[in-house]
Amino acid sequence: MKAIALLEVQAMVAAITGLDAMVKAADVRLIHVEKRLGGRLVTVVVEGEVSAVRAALEAGAAAAAEVGKVKCCEVIARPHPDVMAFLTA
């Protein structure tokens, strides 16, 4: 079963640190990065199996929180095709 994890952080350094932890912690793949406010608000999206995505998000949020502020994070299991189209457009 596929899932996505969204990690929204304040600051690019926190996003990179969180993403690094996510891809090292589990078998997930980066599918989207969105930068807002000149990189002061960054959302990282990864995909993989549900258990891998959950483990990755836990590790990524913890790592990002050490160097910045985590605004929001969420796992979406079996995202609708329209959600995936929105993310990859």
Where is each model-derived feature located?
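Long, contiguous binding/interaction regions
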Residues: 1-40, 45-89
